[in-house]
Amino acid sequence: MRVLTGLQPSGDLHIGNYFGAIKQMVDAQEKSQMFMFIANYHAMTSSQDGEKLKQNSLKAAAAFLSLGIDPQKSVFWLQSDVKEVMELYWVLSQFTPMGLLERAHSYKDKVAKGLSASHGLFSYPVLMAADILLFDTQIVPVGKDQIQHVEIARDIALKVNNEWGEIFTLPEAKVNEEVAVVVGTDGAKMSKSYQNTIDIFSSEKTLKKQISSIVTDSTALEDPKDHENCNIFKIAKLFLDESGQKELQIRYEKGGEGYGHFKMYLNELVNAYFKEAREKYNELLEKPSHLKEILDFGATKARKIAQEKMQKIYEKIGL
């Protein structure tokens, strides 16, 4: 089963990114043919700062590798290192009705949030379709807000296949209903947009500050506490097995500990869980040439597949 996912280099990763998506990708490496790329072309729709994009791309590569992405098990590359995706993007554009793109929810949402209404943003789903179809992707893991983009890729693929024969594999969106929705420090869904994150690779000082900002109720220290509705508990249980969760629940129900104690405990859990990943992340960032070698290794494998696919398409077009 060939699975593909693209990840934008949009800044620091938080534990919501990890438990909501990255952990599932790492686990999937053992049973699927994983294709993962850092979507730096896509990131240009929100920022055209070249130096920032370059640094964020390297940080993203270091982050994913340190969290368990294995370049020997997965094909892992930088989107812009496989130029064929832009060639396919242009070909697919000829098969994409304007009305199909005008119905895209994400375009309207992003413009409403202040992003410039550029052609790049408008045609974002066509580039995403090129990412998917270039590699004969079967499964695309997505959040519910991205299902429509995979459906657009299918629509375009069907149109091309009707014209030229079975050129493209029809992809399917996979929404994992069991994926954790991680609450942020304010109790809403954890998101950079809400400024309520607990970042994985932040300094210990910043981590402590973020955890200290978790919103709690005013229950007195000596009184029993409601673990089910406590944001600290909701986050802590992600790091605990069943027995660990039960032990923490008992501490809540017993009373005698304040929320400050539970925040300190959560701080210890997060630090311990990501200790090795942080060390590896910092080591990788100190060796940008090594990071580039890893990305080049993946790009070479991805490019070979992409070139074979494009050769078939060139023959159909007459190029």
Model-derived features with residue positions:
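N-terminal Rossmann-like or analogous alpha/beta NTP/dinucleotide-binding catalytic cores
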Residues: 2-130, 282
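Short, polar/flexible loop-turn hinges at active-site or ligand-entry regions and domain interfaces
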Residues: 49-50, 139-143, 222
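Conserved nucleotide- and phosphate/pyrophosphate-binding catalytic cores
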Residues: 148, 154-319
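Short helix-capping/linker segments at secondary-structure and domain boundaries
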Residues: 98-102, 134-141, 240-248, 278
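A generic secondary-structure signal for well-formed alpha-helical elements
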Residues: 61, 68, 96-99, 137, ...
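Internal, conserved structured core segments that host functional sites
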Residues: 106-160, 164
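Short catalytic-loop micro-motif centered on adjacent basic/acidic residues
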Residues: 75-78, 141, 219
